Each structure stands twice: as C-alpha cells, then as structure tokens.
Swiss-Prot record:
The name this protein goes by in its record: Kinesin-like protein Klp68D
Domain Kinesin motor, residue spans: 19-344
Keyword Nucleotide-binding: yes
Low complexity compositional bias, start-end: 782-791
Coiled coil: 350-384, 432-580
A GO cellular-component term linked to this record: microtubule associated complex
Organism (species): Drosophila pseudoobscura pseudoobscura
Family under the similarity heading: Belongs to the TRAFAC class myosin-kinesin ATPase superfamily. Kinesin family. Kinesin II subfamily.
Length: 797
C-alpha cells in the first residue's frame, strides 16, 4: 500500500492500521442520455483525485459539491491503467500472505460488471478479475523454492440467499463465524493449475448467475457475486506456510422502480438489492463514525464483508458513477458513501502457518503414501527374484524325461508295456512336482498383481496430490521475458509515484490558504483590500458549500430519523400487542417457563427454546396438577373475547372460527312436500252468477223464522220482479204470483213453498245455460238458503 492509504489513526504495535482505499470511476455518456439531451453534472480531475458535482437545475441555490478520494478516473481511463495503478499492489500483498478485497459499488448501469469482469475475448477491455488471474500465475511461475495450492470458489447472494454458482443444485448455504473470520461451510472449491482453469471456472459461474433486463441496463445483475481465491504458499527450504485470500465482489446496483420500470419478480429483486446496499451503507456510516455497534448482521452481504470492512483485510472500494443529470441524486449518494468509507480503518495481518491450511495436509499425506509404497516395492523386488530362480530349475527336468522316452522306444516289444508303465509313473511324479511349482508361481503372481494394483492406486493418489501442488520457478522463459518483468516493475513504480503526487497535491491545496498571507507581500492598501476580498469570496464560497452540505445532512438525518421512528413505533405496537395476548391468554407458569428457556441464536438470528423437557405445573388444592386459568375469563373452557361471543351466536359462515367447540350449526332443512292445497271444483260462469246473486243478503243475514215473514216476503218480491223483468219486461208473469202472494196469509210459510213448487223451478243439480232463456211461464226462483252448503251457517244463525 502507498503511504497515502495509511492515514493518521490508531496503529497496532505489529501491523499499522490501513484505511480503505477508495477510487471513483465515471463512465461515459450513454447513447440514450445523449439523445435525450441530458447535461453532464460530473467533473473529474484525475491528477488531484477530485470529483465535482453540480446541480444544473438549482445552480443558483446550490454550490458545487467537491469530493476528494485516493484516485479518480474519468471516462477516458483504460482498464489497464486502472488495474496497474490501483489493483496490482493489492494482489501483490495477497501473494505475500495478506487478505484482500476489491468490490465495485454504485448505481445500476454505471459499469460495475464491466470494471470487474470486462469484455470477453478482448485483451484491452479485460476486467479486474481476469487480470488478477494472470498476475497470480506470473508470480507463481517466476517464484523458486515454493509450492503453491490455488483454490477458487464462486457464489452469489440472490434474494438474501446464498447460492453456489459452481454447483447450482447444491443445498442451502449459511454464513458461519469462527476465530479466523467469516466463512461459508459446504462451499464447493475447485483446484486450479493455470490461468485457463480459473477463466473456465469464472465462465461456468457467470452462466449460472442471475441477470435480467431493466430500462436502465439490458444485462442488469440481479445478485451480488463473490469470486473467492485462496492461495497457499509453502517455502520448501524453511517449510513455512502462508495463506492469502482475495475476494473479488461485483455488487448489484441500487435502483429506483420509477426509472428501471421493474415489476413482478424484478421488483422483488430490486427491493432485496436495495435492502442489502442500505445495510452496507449503514455499516460504512457506523465504521466511519466509530460507532460501538456495527450492524454486520443486517444482511448476508455485510456478514461476508465483515473482514473486509474494519477487519483483517486490505480493501479497495471502486465507486462507479454516471455523469448525467438524470442520475444526480444517485450519484450524490454514491459519492457521499464513498467519502465516508475513506475513514474506515482495517487491521491487515499476514496469515502465517494457519491451522486449516490444505497444503500442510497434502504434504503430510504425500509423505505417508511414500512410506507405504517404499516397503511394498522392496518386497515386490524380492519376490520377483525368487520367482526367477524357480523358473530356472524347471527346464532341467525336461532332458531326463526325453532319455526315459528314448530308452523305452529302444526296448523290446515284450517289455514295452512294462517300460511304458514305469515311464508313466515317473512322468506322473514329475508332473505333480511341476504342478506344485506352477501353483506357487501363480499364487505369487496373484499376490504381486494385487500389490501392483495397490501400488498403482497409491501412486495415482500420490501423483494427484503432487499435481495439485504447483512448484514455482517453471516455464518462466516460455511465459514472460525478462524485459516484460522489468516493464511491469516500472509500471508499479510509476503507479506509486502517481499516488505520491496526488497526495502531495492534496496537501498543497490544504496548506495553500494558511500560507497565502506569508507568501504574498502587500504593497499598498488597495492591494490588501483586493486580497482580502478574494479571500473573503473564497471563504464565503466554502461557507455556502458547508452550509449546503449541512442542510443536506440534516435532511438525510431527519429522513432517516423519521423512518427509524416509524419502524420503532411499529415494533413497539407489535410488542405491546404480543405482551397483551401473553398476559391475558397464557398461564403465568407457562409464560415464566418460556422466558427462562428462550435463548437467542446469533448464527441463525432468531430465538430458540431449549430441548430439555418441561417441568410439570404446580398442583392445585385438590391434589391434581394443572394450570391456573388466564385472567381473561377463569370460568370458560378457553379464553374468549366479547366479539367472539357475539359472533358465535350468529350462524353466518364467517362465525365458524368463533365457535367454542368447533361444531358447525346449520338451519333445519325441510323435506319435499308430498301434499297439495285443496281446490274447489270449477263452476260454470252462469251458475256462479246465480249463486253469487243468491248469496247477496243486502247487508243482513237470512233468518227464516216466523217473526221475520215481512222481510222475507219483500225480498221474495224483489227476486220475482227482477226475474220477471229479465224475461218479459216489467209486470209480465207477475200477476198470478202476486195474486197468490197477496191472497195468502202474511205469516204462512206453506204459501212460500206452494209458490216455488207451482213454478216448476229446476233442481240444484241441473245445469243452466246463460244463452238459453227459461221456458215460458216458468220464472226461476231462488232456492232457500238451506239448499246451498255455504249458506247453511247463515240459515242456522
């Protein structure tokens, strides 16, 4: 690190503290911004490390905002310049045994992925990650008397979940913490032996990374990607081991829904991304203000960056910004957070002889395998010597058998059979001895074959372990020439010199005002007044800038305070509600036992209960063990509110959840009707008219008694007159009836019967047609009330 990165601060007795190195890079204007005519609001001065931001909308009200960083690069800066001046020294420190971290921070669409990964297939546009691979293997190839073990891992944080990009279908990953720092167990690591292997791993991970389309970026990263490189180095002369770890982080950009047009799944991703970046901003603010509590556990991203921010690491933060006025607010926020990160101090420590170094384990395993193979090879050589001796003795018996066969052929024919039997016995004895020797040889060959297979397996395992260890100092002339190595050294020296120049320039600007009066001599009062005016104008401009900065800080502070107050009010309200439920619906013994058994798990960030069995509740007055009823209602079987009681009385579908016994009550369902209403038989219209006229009593009931003969006579006359008028006009056929009526006694009922019978009226069952007139001389008369069923009641009355 340069001297400029070691700002004043507390220093350890062993290793001085180092501040986070902050670099700002501004991308060029996009085609869309040019077509829309958006003005540029960012001015970058690389020779001083200064970035100026001007609000063109309120140029009269707001002053230019000036920010100073360790380095600043405009749109014309190349990838090679950025790497050699900023990243190259950090990677060299990692190769010496330190921990390093490089992460790109900024708004979406500002070139973070381009800075970290670059363009594939173009050497000039390669990003930081592939250039890091080349520097690592260049160092390995030209370092002698060292063994190296290089492992790489690749993961992403998507929707606050860790995913292994090298094993997409792996199980869920968690962040753990131990004495040496934060780590991710069960993360797949791949051993690499060259630059091509590391590039191949990076391509595999990039294919599995989550990207999406937004209005601000066609290939927007929807997750935070972390490429981890672990380099173990062993000095073969002193047998000391050093471990360097490098984390290359490509953060997803912060975004606003109104600008990106995110919806559905993209909107959920944006909310999680903004939440993680907000947590990162809170961590940076807490570290910059030396707060006693740093909220590392607010997100998975801050947990993984715990060592990089304020821990055992050398860190570079590359803040990417856009020059357009369209992104003014986002650019201002990024510059402020980057300015705060300058004051974060880390404590880098060289990792020497770590306990978890794989290189040490591999060396011990190689020595063990060599010790196993050596005696087996010696035993194998001894067995091969004995087998050769046995094979030499075997051919000596063959001439003996040939002589016996020759003598048997020269014998007589009489003794031929005897000689053949003897020869066969001799051949059988020799064949048995040969078979025994062959069995021993076969057995020895089998044992040797098994040992050979075992030795081959051990040798293959040994070769595999030795193959993973890369020995330095090989193929140096084939990779880089001496002139190229010297050129790289010169580039590093130039980068260091440029950093020192920027530091000196910044110090001169700070001391310029204090030395202004000493350097300038006043000749007259007018010149003194002019100098005072210029000094006053500068001071006033600084005052306005500081006042604007103070107002912005107050606005941001008030906004954060309001958000915190709202969150606190919601939490307090929820806490009171939960406590109210516990106090009124949970027995006191249960509540006390739960409070004593609850433990907070810092790894899982949640409360858990101990697994030991719960004690029995205290016994009551009757000797039975049981809980006391809650204070809500001790008589009921369960606590019930007044609203639940009212709802339980109703039979609405929504009231089922308020039933105390969980029994559904329904209305009675009536069966289908099997009977019908009685309907009177239909009567013809003419008969209905006659019956209706007969039933008209004129307001009085028909009383057929001796005391009402006068009324009965008058009514009968009215009926007869009406019938006569309808048949033959007035007075027709009325003479005989009137005479008979007049001549009869007034109260004599038999006279009425005589009148009805003398006219020959039809019976009740005879149907009358309304179109047919009754026969001449017959006047229809009304029957007595007793003849009609409906009139019987009137007659009785």
């Amino acid at each position: 690190m340069s001297a400029k990165s070691r700002r004043p601060g507390t220093a350890s007795s062993q290793t001085p503290n180092e501040c986070v190195q902050v670099v700002v890079r501004c991308r060029p204007m996009s085609n869309r911004e040019r077509s829309e005519g958006s003005p540029e609001v960012v001015n970058v001065y690389p020779n001083r490390g200064v970035v100026e931001l001007q609000n063109v909308v309120d140029a009269n009200k707001e002053q230019r905002k000036v920010f100073t960083y360790d380095a600043a690069y405009d749109a014309s800066a190349s990838q090679t310049t950025l790497y050699h001046e900023v990243v190259f020294p950090l990677v060299s420190s990692v190769l010496e045994g330190f921990n390093g971290c490089i992460f790109a921070y900024g708004q979406t669409g500002t070139g973070k992925t381009f800075t970290m990964e670059g363009v594939r297939g173009n050497d000039d546009l390669m990003g930081i990650i592939p250039r890091t691979f080349e520097q690592i293997w260049l160092h390995i190839n030209r370092t002698e008397n060292f063994q190296f073990l290089v492992d790489v891992s690749y993961l992403e944080i998507y929707m606050e979940e860790l995913r292994d990009l090298l094993k997409p279908n792996s199980k869920h990953l968690e962040v753990r913490e131990r004495g040496s720092g934060v780590y991710v167990p069960n993360l797949h690591a791949i051993n690499c032996k060259s630059v091509d292997d590391m590039i191949r791993v990076m391509k595999v991970g990039n294919k599995n990374r989550t990207v999406g389309f937004t209005n601000m970026n066609e290939h927007s990263s929807r997750s935070h990607a972390i490429f981890m490189i672990k380099i173990e180095m062993c000095d073969t002369e002193t047998n000391t081991i050093k471990v360097g770890k490098l984390n290359l982080i490509d953060l997803a950009g912060s975004e606003r829904q109104s600008k990106t047009g995110a919806s559905a799944e993209r909107l959920k991703e944006a909310s999680k991304i903004n939440l993680a970046l907000s947590s990162l901003g809170n961590v940076i603010s807490a570290l910059a203000e030396s707060s006693p509590h740093v909220p590392y556990r607010d997100s998975k991203l801050t947990r993984l960056l715990q060592d990089s921010l304020g821990g055992n690491s050398k860190t570079i933060m590359i803040a990417n910004i856009g020059p357009s006025n369209y992104n003014y607010n986002e650019t201002l926020t990024t510059l402020r957070y980057a300015s705060r990160a300058k004051s974060i101090q880390n404590q880098p420590i060289k990792n020497e002889d770590p306990q978890d170094a794989k290189l040490k384990e591999y060396q011990e395993e190689i020595e063990r395998l060599k010790r196993l193979i050596a005696p087996q090879q010696q035993q194998r050589s001894e067995k091969q010597g004995t087998i050769k001796k046995q094979r030499v003795k075997k051919p000596k018996k063959e001439p003996i058998s040939q002589e016996l066969i020759g003598s048997a052929l020269q014998a007589s024919s009489a003794d031929l059979q005897v000689d053949e039997d003897r020869d066969s016995d001799g051949d059988g004895a020799e064949s048995e001895s040969d078979k025994e020797n062959e069995a021993e040889v076969a057995k020895s060959n089998e044992e040797l074959e098994r040992e050979r297979v075992e030795n081959a397996k051990l040798a293959a395992k040994l070769a595999e372990l030795e193959g993973q260890l890369v020995r330095g100092g090989k193929n140096l002339l084939d990779t880089y020439s001496e002139r190229q190595i010297e050129l790289e050294k010169k580039l590093v020296e130039i980068a260091e010199r440029k950093k020192r120049e920027i530091e000196i320039q910044q110090q001169l600007e700070l001391q310029e005002e204090t030395t202004l009066e000493i350097r300038e001599r006043n000749v007259s009062l007018e010149q003194e007044v002019e100098l005072k005016k210029r000094k006053l104008s500068k001071c006033y401009a600084k005052y306005l800038a500081l006042q604007q900065e103070l107002n912005d800080c107050k606005h941001d502070h008030n906004q954060d305070l309001r958000e915190l107050e709202m969150a606190q009010n919601e939490l307090v309200k929820e806490l009171k509600r939960q406590l109210l439920i516990i106090d009124n619906f949970v027995p006191i013994e249960v509540k006390q036992r739960l409070y004593t058994q609850a433990k907070y798990d810092e790894e899982q960030e949640e409360w858990k209960f101990s697994s030991f069995p719960l004690p029995l509740p205290p016994s009551g007055g009757d000797g039975r063990q049981g809980y006391r009823r809650p204070v809500s209602h001790p008589q009921r079987r369960r606590p019930t509110s007044e609203h639940a009681l009212q709802e339980a009385k109703s039979n609405a579908p929504s009231s089922l959840r308020f039933k105390s016994e969980n029994i559904v009550s329904y209305e009675l369902e009536m069966p289908c009707r099997t009977t019908q209403e009685y309907r009177t038989p239909k009567v013809s219209a003419s008969l209905q008219a006659v019956l209706a006229q007969a039933m008209q009593t004129g307001g009085d009931d028909i009383d057929i008694v001796d005391s009402h003969t006068n009324s009965l006579r008058s009514r009968l006359e009215n009926i007869i007159n009406a019938n006569s008028s309808s048949n033959g006009g007035p007075g027709s056929g009325a003479g005989p009836l009137a005479a008979n009526t007049a001549g009869s006694g007034v109260g004599s009922m038999p006279n009425v019967r005589n009148i009805k019978s003398s006219r020959g009226l039809p019976s009740a069952g005879t149907a009358l047609d309304s179109n047919r007139r009754p026969p001449t001389g017959r006047i229809p008369a009304k029957k007595p009330a007793s003849a009609y069923p409906k009139a019987r009641g009137l007659v009785n009355k």
